[in-house]
């Protein structure tokens, strides 16, 4: 299996390339309780239209082993830059889902030398009011492993039109997590502070699920309002919950393609 050594981390990744010269490179960061394969169908749609797509498992998720060292939004951002360095990619469009939707704007604000644009899919707006919920989640996983998450999230976190196969994949993603790694990534969200949204000067697309309870529309609108660039767009996906790329993959691909064409 393909791994990259990024500092002290061993990161499992995939690099999907189109035939011929790529129009642009995208790098994708998944969210809590997920893996690079959350994006698989989206990447195949984009590769078919000439884009290079890099996906990877966050440390402690999927096939990237947990290091037992605490992580943060900043260290996760460093991982993305490290992957780009290792693959000799000078600049890329960064895509982040959920927790990754905190990391992507952090990079857009602080590393615009490496970021072409940012796409935030169901981005979480860091909020102290969410801390008790994550503390309860950590306690449940410490006691019972990932089973409680797998028994609730696949139905609770999606929109009413989510296909059964999407729920099945969400369940598999959750059951496949290392509980210690999952807890570590919960703590990243607990400790997260809002990125410097006003500093962002690259184009930004936000995809918000109309029925998203994990990253509610109100928070997505708040992020949109705080983003500094005038080159920004908020798309509200009807009847979609928090797992956009599994619930409505074709729509996600079309929205990303449309946004990319607009910023050229």
Predicted regions and their residues:
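Conserved HGGG/HGGXW glycine-rich cap/lid loop of the alpha/beta-hydrolase fold
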Residues: 9-65
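Short alpha-helix in the alpha/beta-hydrolase fold that links the catalytic acid
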Residues: 202, 216-225
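Flexible "cap/lid" loop of the alpha/beta hydrolase fold
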Residues: 102-110, 114-148
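Active-site loop/oxyanion-hole signature of alpha/beta-hydrolase fold enzymes
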Residues: 40-43, 48, 52-95, 254
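Catalytic histidine-centered segment of alpha/beta-hydrolase-like enzymes
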Residues: 240-249, 253
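Catalytic histidine neighborhood in serine/cysteine hydrolases
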Residues: 225-242
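Conserved alpha/beta-hydrolase catalytic His-Asp/Glu region
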Residues: 128-132, 142-199
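Short beta-strand/loop motif that positions the catalytic acidic residue
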Residues: 200, 206-208, 212
């Amino acid at each position: 299996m393909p791994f990259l050594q990024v500092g002290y981390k061993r990161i499992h990744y995939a690099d999907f390339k189109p035939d011929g010269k790529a129009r642009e490179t995208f790098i994708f960061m998944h969210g809590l309780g997920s893996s690079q394969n959350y994006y698989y169908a989206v990447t195949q749609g984009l590769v078919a239209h000439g884009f290079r797509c890099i996906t990877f498992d966050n440390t402690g998720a999927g096939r990237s082993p947990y290091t037992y060292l605490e992580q943060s939004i900043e260290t996760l951002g460093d991982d993305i830059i490290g992957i780009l360095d290792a693959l000799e990619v000078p600049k890329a469009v960064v895509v982040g889902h959920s927790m990754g939707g905190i990391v992507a704007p952090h990079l857009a604000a602080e590393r615009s030398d490496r970021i072409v644009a940012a796409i935030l899919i169901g981005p979480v707006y860091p909020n102290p009011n969410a801390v008790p919920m994550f503390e309860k989640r950590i306690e449940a996983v410490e006691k019972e492993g990932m089973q409680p998450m797998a028994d609730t999230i696949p139905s609770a976190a999606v929109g009413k039109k989510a296909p059964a196969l999407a729920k099945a994949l969400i369940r598999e993603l959750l059951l496949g997590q290392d509980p210690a790694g999952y807890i570590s990534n919960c703590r990243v969200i607990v400790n997260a502070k809002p990125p410097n949204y006003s500093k962002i000067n690259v184009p930004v697309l936000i995809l918000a699920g109309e029925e998203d309870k994990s990253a509610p529309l109100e928070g997505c609108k708040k992020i949109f309002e705080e983003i500094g660039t005038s080159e920004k767009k908020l798309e509200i996906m009807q009847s979609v919950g928090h797992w956009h790329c599994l619930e409505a993959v074709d729509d996600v691909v079309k929205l990303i393609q449309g946004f990319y064409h607009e910023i050229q």
